């Protein structure tokens, strides 16, 4: 009797098995997306790779790096911690964890992890580059270790020796040069990093900041615009565009970008303060006092967003600007009781701030004028910026 082997036939109604993609294919996609500046798709592809193979610490590290560039610092921390759980001896995992923690202000723990990374591999160029960023950020805090900037300079040179042509090395050199006031040299380093990958928003933001400090406002605006296009949900490019347009006297555009910044992060009181300043410069007195009132008093927005007040302290010129602009706007509305309260606060808390005291005097003068004349009510629907008393401000 003849026998035939009949191949398995698919059963009706039962789906055919779908070929499973390899984790390597997802990693390739992620790297391609990253090089194109598509950070969110890159993140999603790395996550797909992890779903396909959850036991590769290197993929968690790569994911964490992109998450930092995207500004997802808490998520980057979790990814790096997952890598460490899989391999506690991974120098890169500890390095990226330290890097992610520094962006959250936890510099002590960040430095602990970066030191562990270098203990595991003292020739890890990226760890040295990340250490530069950590130390520079740390140096701006009251608890900064002695010699943080000097150590950052040393670490940046080690990174250059180990990997002179890496994006992270150019970025680290740019950061330390900027921190030491060498803006032209910092610009050169950031441009070299952008030549390697022009699709990382933070690099354009950093380059724009240095152009702005040097007074190259058109170039700064171009870089901030690039950063904004690459990461439209980040309020920082909008904030810097707002301040830069205000510096060159284009107050209508400065107001628009200030509004965009607040839309991106409605709970940031500092952004509310900036918006209040720009409303003032466009002669929207009522709107100005509303936004600046959040800075001085805190409270809740109409949609219930909580906002914390920002105290007026010495050596904080931006905060001082919020306070004296609030006082100026109140005086414009003939609310001189509140306005003079701001004057007293300025004179008591920051008496050596010449700019703030000068504007406090302007508030008093405006209120004295209000006593002897009937103020003409402003027309916020048709502002005349030229008629406003524009406070002098640090750009």
How should each PLM-predicted stretch be described?
Residues 19-58, 62-72, 103, 137-145, ...:
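Alpha-helical segment of the N-proximal tetratricopeptide repeat
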Residues 52, 86, 120, 162, ...:
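Structural marker of alpha-solenoid helical repeat scaffolds
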Residues 304-395:
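Terminal, low-structured helical/coil segments at or just beyond the last alpha-helical repeat
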């Amino acid at each position: 009797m003849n026998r035939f082997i009949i191949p398995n036939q698919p059963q009706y109604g039962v789906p055919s098995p779908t070929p499973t993609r390899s984790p390597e294919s997802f990693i390739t996609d992620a790297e391609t997306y990253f090089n194109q500046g598509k950070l969110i798709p890159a993140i999603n592809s790395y996550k797909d790779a992890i779903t396909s193979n959850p036991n590769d610490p290197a993929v968690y590290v790569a994911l964490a790096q992109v998450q930092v560039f995207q500004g997802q610092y808490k998520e980057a921390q979790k990814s790096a911690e997952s890598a460490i759980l899989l391999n506690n001896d991974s120098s890169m995992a500890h390095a990226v964890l330290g890097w992610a923690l520094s962006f959250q202000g936890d510099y002590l723990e960040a430095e602990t992890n970066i030191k562990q990374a270098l203990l595991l591999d003292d020739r890890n160029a990226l760890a040295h580059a990340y250490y530069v960023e950590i130390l520079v950020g740390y140096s701006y805090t009251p608890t900064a270790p002695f010699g943080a900037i000097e150590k950052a300079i040393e670490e940046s040179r080690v990174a250059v020796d180990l990997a002179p042509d890496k994006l992270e090395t150019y970025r680290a050199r740019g950061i330390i040069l900027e921190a030491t006031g060498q803006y032209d040299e910092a610009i050169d380093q950031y441009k070299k990093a952008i030549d390697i990958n022009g699709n990382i928003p933070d690099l354009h933001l950093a380059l724009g900041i240095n152009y702005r400090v040097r007074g190259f406002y058109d170039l700064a605006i171009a870089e901030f615009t690039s950063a904004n296009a690459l990461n439209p949900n980040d309020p920082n490019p909008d904030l810097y565009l707002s301040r830069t347009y205000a510096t060159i006297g284009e107050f209508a555009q400065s107001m628009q970008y200030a509004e965009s910044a607040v839309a991106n992060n409605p709970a940031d009181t500092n952004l509310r303060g900036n918006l209040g300043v720009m409303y003032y410069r466009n002669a929207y007195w009522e709107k100005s006092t509303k936004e600046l009132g959040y800075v001085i008093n805190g409270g809740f927005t109409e949609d219930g967003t909580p906002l914390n007040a920002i105290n007026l302290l010495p050596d904080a010129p931006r905060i001082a600007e919020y306070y004296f602009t609030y006082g100026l706007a109140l005086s414009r509305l003939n609310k001189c009781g509140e306005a003079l309260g701001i004057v007293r606060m300025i004179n008591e808390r920051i008496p050596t701030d010449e700019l703030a005291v000068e504007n406090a005097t302007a508030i008093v003068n405006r209120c004295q004028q209000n006593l002897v004349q009937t103020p003409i009510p402003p027309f916020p629907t048709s502002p005349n910026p030229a008629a406003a008393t524009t406070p002098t401000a640090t750009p």
